């Protein structure tokens, strides 16, 4: 499952892993113990939420958030016993406090400050351990297009930039997650949860032997342990299985992060920053499993979904044209259920602009229902799974729509039944 030990190890620490002075101390202990070649860090837990709120507020009402963010980071620095200058970041926020309209380019600069701050604190504290650690600026490595708030990495540019870096083998490089830059140096961000994506891109660039994701749970569970009790740790998943979980609501990993690891065949290990047993879940290309029949490995719940249906106005309409139209408007279809006369697909309910309806009317009659919940059952060889067991477990709970493939069964249900249905199915399948 692992590459040669001489290949680089990439470690990524999420927001809860760097949320307090105590947790940052733990992060530095792990870095000292594991000696990864590259470390990618998220913003301090909750700070990106504050920065998003900063961007939403009108001018004249943002100063309180600047002070809140300042107090949080200066308090952490004081508790860590380090002296570090963060003044440049407060100057940026203060500059934008009274700007009338924050454009997407401005918002990207603001949102990136969370990772700029956390990486500065962690780098400074790690140096007290006398570690051979240097800062690697994400804006020089994660090169993207100019979609400032949902930037798409340009792998060709990144590979060129990577080859020009004078990296030293005996040095640990610490980099901000979530953010990057255009070829002209303007700051971009990869979207919420994008630090996972940053780490996987680094894993691809350096041909890592392993990407280790440190979070607040010890791996991937049979359901979200923050929603259900008595969930079980999953030892291993394939990339395909994890992709299904991530795209249907599992928050443990960002769904875009898997593609670089698939391309470069970099295995992922998800574990907890705070669990000394070092339990976790391996995610890799294939597993040495001998299951003969279908098996359910995990459930995921995604709330606040919109179910769209396009009834084709011509037999010449193609599925890829409909989905391409949706993507061209900046939306990512979730579950897609194609029929001969039309197609169902889901997107987040908040993303319900009239522009989608108008654009899709070129292909046929358009309808939308929501908000709804999506419950996904993920596993292997599920195309032959008998749905009777699922419907028996749900009793009289109405299922509005469902689909079944070899790796996932998707159920679209009323939004009020999401947690209850997930719990019912989990009890039925795993107890």
UniProtKB/Swiss-Prot annotation:
Coiled-coil segments: none
Keywords in alphabetical order: Amino-acid biosynthesis, ATP-binding, Diaminopimelate biosynthesis, Kinase, Lysine biosynthesis, Nucleotide-binding, Transferase
Pfam families per record: AA_kinase
Reactions that this protein is recorded to catalyse: L-aspartate + ATP = 4-phospho-L-aspartate + ADP
Top-level taxon: Bacteria
GO CC terms of this entry: cytosol
Pathway(s) the chain acts in: Amino-acid biosynthesis; L-lysine biosynthesis via DAP pathway; (S)-tetrahydrodipicolinate from L-aspartate: step 1/4; Amino-acid biosynthesis; L-methionine biosynthesis via de novo pathway; L-homoserine from L-aspartate: step 1/3; Amino-acid biosynthesis; L-threonine biosynthesis; L-threonine from L-aspartate: step 1/5
EC number: 2.7.2.4
S-S pairs: none
A Gene Ontology BP annotation from the UniProt entry: homoserine biosynthetic process
CDD domains per the UniProt record, alphabetical: AAK_AK-HSDH-like
Record-level Gene Ontology MF annotations: aspartate kinase activity; ATP binding
Xref: PROSITE patterns: ASPARTOKINASE (PS00324)
Family to which this protein belongs: Belongs to the aspartokinase family.
NCBIfam families: asp_kinases, PRK05925.1
Protein's UniProt name: Aspartokinase
Gene transcribed to yield this protein: lysC
């Amino acid at each position: 499952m692992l590459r040669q030990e001489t290949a680089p190890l990439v470690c990524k620490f999420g927001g809860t892993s760097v949320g307090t002075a105590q947790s940052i101390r733990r992060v530095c202990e792990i870095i000292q113990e594991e000696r990864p070649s590259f470390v990618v860090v998220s913003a301090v837990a909750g700070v990106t939420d504050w920065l998003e709120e900063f961007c939403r507020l009108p001018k004249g009402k943002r100063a309180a958030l600047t002070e809140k963010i300042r107090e949080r980071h200066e308090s952490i620095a004081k508790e860590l016993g380090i002296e570090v200058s963060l003044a440049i970041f407060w100057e940026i926020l203060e500059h934008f406090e009274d700007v009338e309209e924050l454009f997407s380019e401005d918002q990207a600069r603001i949102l990136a400050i969370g990772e700029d701050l956390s990486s500065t604190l962690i780098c400074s504290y790690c140096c007290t351990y006398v570690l051979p650690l240097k800062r690697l600026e994400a804006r020089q490595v994660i090169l993207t297009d100019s979609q400032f708030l949902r930037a798409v990495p340009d792998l060709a540019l990144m590979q060129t930039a990577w080859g020009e870096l004078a990296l030293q083998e005996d040095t640990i490089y610490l980099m901000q997650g979530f953010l990057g830059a255009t070829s002209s140096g303007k700051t971009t961000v990869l979207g919420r949860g994008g630090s996972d994506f940053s780490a996987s891109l680094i894993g691809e660039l350096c041909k890592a032997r392993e990407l280790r994701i440190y979070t607040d749970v010890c791996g991937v569970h049979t359901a979200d342990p923050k929603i259900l009790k008595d969930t079980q740790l999953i030892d291993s998943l394939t990339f395909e299985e994890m992709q299904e979980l991530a795209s249907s609501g599992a928050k443990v990993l960002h769904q875009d992060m898997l593609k670089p690891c698939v391309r470069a065949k970099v295995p992922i290990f998800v574990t907890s920053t705070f669990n000394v047993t070092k339990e976790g879940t391996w995610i890799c290309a294939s597993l040495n499993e001998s299951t003969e029949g279908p098996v359910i490995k995990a459930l995921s719940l995604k709330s606040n979904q919109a179910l769209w249906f396009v009834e084709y106005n011509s037999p010449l309409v193609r599925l890829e044209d409909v989905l391409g139209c949706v993507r061209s408007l900046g939306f990512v279809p979730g579950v897609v259920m194609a029929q001969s006369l039309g197609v169902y697909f889901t997107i987040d309910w908040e993303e319900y602009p009239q522009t989608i309806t108008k654009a899709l009317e070129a292909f046929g009659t358009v309808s939308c229902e929501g908000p709804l919940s999506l419950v996904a059952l993920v596993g292997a060889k599920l195309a032959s799974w008998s749905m009777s067991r699922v419907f028996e477990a749900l009793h009289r709970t109405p299922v509005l729509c469902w689909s079944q493939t070899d790796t996932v069964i998707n159920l679209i249900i009323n939004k009020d039944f999401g947690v209850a249905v997930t719990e019912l199915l989990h009890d039925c399948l795993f107890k």
